[in-house]
Amino acid sequence: MQVEDLDYDNMKLDVLVMAAHPDDAELACSGTILSLIQQGKKVGVVDFTRGELGTRGTPEIRLAESAEATKIMGLHARENLEIRDGFFQNDEATQLKLVKVIRKYQPDVVLANALEDRHPDHGKGAKLAIDACFL
């Protein structure tokens, strides 16, 4: 799923932020994202899940919030892989979904959640990001 009103054709990104849930990129590195965009860099975000197991809000609310954050920050691209929240695996099928996004945008730099994080999805997401980048 892509955020509407963005031109995704032939979009080479300087930086691609990979996040387990909608709002992770904003909470973890929005200052960095804004700084990079102000420097003229093309920055995008790929959210792995819709955050459907989150205790605050619904997937629909999270989608609307991420679309609004995309506009406010001036992101050049944002996609959601719609992987099952809480239970996603770092397996071949999931890696290939992410590889498709990586090859589409050909980022020079990738940012992801920390490998060691209080939230288990963040660590799993970081490992998925690392593995997909090397396929």
What are these regions (language model features)?
Residues 1-105:
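Active-site rim/loop-helix segments in enzyme catalytic domains that contact anionic ligands
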